[in-house]
């Protein structure tokens, strides 16, 4: 969350930022709650001082009538303080709810836009494949090659689930190993993370775990949720910790990701593109404030490097204000070319990386020492490999006229094969 003092000192900036993000929030309500809370704290302090004076007066050698008066006065002060403290508790709770709704300030170079259509293309890389046949989409390819089964998954688990089969199993594991090997060489600590997190961690990272807007699954009768990304569990790893940050602390975590994907439908969401469960290798970094922009750009470069080595055409987007998540100061998306997407092929999102500055660390109480003072760390996240969408891009870009699929050279040492042959 933003520092409350910063909000009060920069009301017009915060108000404009809320507007640019397409949100309707009652900033004045937040300020009114804070104003009343401050007055109550002052009033309670004054009443406690009077109560102490009253208690000290009772220690003197006084008559019965005076003592009775002081006793009654003490009771009245206690009752008034209790009433005000109850009001203070209510206000503090309401203040926190409104405070959490305020999004991070956007970076100066974030484009202002009302929808994802106003994301700005920064770069296009790779050659879009030219086929001398009509390319199939991944769903048709995968069923023909016996790589996945949606029908059986629908019977067993419901819509938007799938079984990976045969070579697709090796291909997913190969993508994960490829990403982990690269990140290990870049100095990341590697993790396989829990797939479950407590509500205060989910909330601290900035995911809304409750209500109709929630995109993650709650485990019934607990305070736990299935994670939508390892960003949640990696970000929570150092909850309530003061770090010794001599250099940026980089982590990479593999997790299953669970998403409700409520309302997602249409041809662009079919097959593996938008599902309830998938595997993902996530990058994460805790760093000093002066390092976060540099690390964010390094994460983008790493994501690009991965897709260059996978030989997949892609483009980089500077995500516009209304498409930013609340914690993000700035976000880049990479979209891979998918020949089977739409009528003539199109780009589809495969990675994102966000600099969340100290927005998450304030909630999670993750700090570092500098010049004898505790400061909130900056937190950066990014996708290394999201298995399902990367699999889509591989199947669709490397299909051939015979109905088979070539494996990218960078994955062959992990798969043990370089081609998926058509089934007879």
Swiss-Prot record:
One of its GO terms (molecular function) is serine-tRNA ligase activity. It catalyses: tRNA(Ser) + L-serine + ATP = L-seryl-tRNA(Ser) + AMP + diphosphate + H(+); tRNA(Sec) + L-serine + ATP = L-seryl-tRNA(Sec) + AMP + diphosphate + H(+). Disulfide bonds: none annotated. Transmembrane segments: none annotated. Pfam families: Seryl_tRNA_N, tRNA-synt_2b. Gene3D superfamilies: Bira Bifunctional Protein, Domain 2 (3.30.930.10), Serine-tRNA synthetase, tRNA binding domain (1.10.287.40). SUPFAM superfamilies: Class II aaRS and biotin synthetases (SSF55681), tRNA-binding arm (SSF46589). Pathway: Aminoacyl-tRNA biosynthesis; selenocysteinyl-tRNA(Sec) biosynthesis; L-seryl-tRNA(Sec) from L-serine and tRNA(Sec): step 1/1. It is found in: Cytoplasm. Keywords: Aminoacyl-tRNA synthetase, ATP-binding, Cytoplasm, Ligase, Nucleotide-binding, Protein biosynthesis. One of its GO terms (cellular component) is cytoplasm. Its EC number is 6.1.1.11. GO terms for biological process: selenocysteine biosynthetic process; seryl-tRNA aminoacylation. ATP binds at residues 259-261, 275, 349-352. The keyword Ion transport does not apply. L-serine binds at residues 229-231, 282, 383. Consists of two distinct domains, a catalytic core and a N-terminal extension that is involved in tRNA binding. Catalyzes the attachment of serine to tRNA(Ser). Is also able to aminoacylate tRNA(Sec) with serine, to form the misacylated tRNA L-seryl-tRNA(Sec), which will be further converted into selenocysteinyl-tRNA(Sec). Belongs to the class-II aminoacyl-tRNA synthetase family. Type-1 seryl-tRNA synthetase subfamily. Homodimer. The tRNA molecule binds across the dimer. This is Serine--tRNA ligase. The gene is serS.
């Amino acid at each position: 969350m933003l520092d409350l003092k910063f909000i009060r000192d920069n009301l017009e900036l915060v108000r404009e930022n809320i507007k640019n993000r397409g949100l309707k929030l009652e900033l004045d309500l937040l300020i009114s709650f804070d104003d009343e809370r401050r007055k109550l704290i002052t009033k309670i302090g004054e009443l406690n001082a009077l109560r102490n004076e009253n208690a000290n007066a009772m220690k003197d050698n006084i008559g019965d009538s005076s003592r009775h008066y002081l006793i009654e006065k003490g009771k009245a002060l206690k009752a008034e303080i209790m009433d005000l403290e109850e009001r203070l508790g209510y206000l503090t709770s309401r203040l926190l709810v409104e405070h959490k709704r305020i999004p991070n300030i956007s970076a100066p170079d974030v484009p202002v836009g009302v929808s994802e259509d106003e994301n700005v293309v920064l770069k296009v890389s790779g050659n879009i494949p030219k086929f001398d046949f009509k390319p199939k989409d991944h769903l048709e390819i995968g069923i023909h090659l016996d790589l996945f089964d949606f029908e059986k998954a629908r019977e067993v688990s419901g819509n938007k689930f799938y079984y990976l089969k045969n070579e697709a199993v090796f291909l997913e594991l190969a993508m994960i190993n490829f990403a982990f090997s690269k990140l290990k060489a870049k100095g990341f600590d590697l993790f396989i993370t829990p797939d479950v997190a407590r509500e205060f961690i989910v909330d601290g990272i900035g995911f809304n775990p409750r209500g109709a807007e929630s995109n993650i699954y709650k485990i019934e009768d607990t305070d736990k949720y299935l994670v939508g990304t390892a960003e949640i569990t990696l970000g929570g790893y150092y909850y309530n910790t003061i770090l010794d940050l001599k250099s940026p602390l980089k982590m990479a975590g593999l997790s299953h990701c669970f998403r409700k994907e409520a309302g997602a439908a249409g041809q662009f969401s079919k097959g593996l593109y938008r599902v309830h469960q998938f595997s993902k290798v996530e990058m994460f970094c805790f760093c000093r404030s002066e390092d976060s922009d540099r690390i964010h750009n390094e994460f983008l470069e790493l994501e690009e490097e991965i897709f260059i080595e996978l030989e997949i055409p892609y483009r980089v987007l500077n995500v516009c204000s209304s498409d930013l998540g609340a914690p993000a100061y700035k976000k880049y998306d990479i979209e891979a070319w998918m020949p089977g997407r739409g009528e003539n092929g199109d780009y589809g999102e495969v990675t994102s990386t966000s600099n969340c500055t100290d927005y998450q660390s304030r909630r999670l109480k993750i700090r570092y020492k500098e010049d004898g003072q505790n400061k909130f760390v900056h937190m950066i996240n990014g996708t290394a490999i999201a298995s399902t969408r990367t699999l889509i891009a591989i199947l669709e870009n490397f299909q051939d006229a015979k109905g088979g699929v070539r494996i990218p050279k960078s994955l062959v040492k992990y798969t043990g094969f370089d081609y998926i042959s058509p089934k007879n």
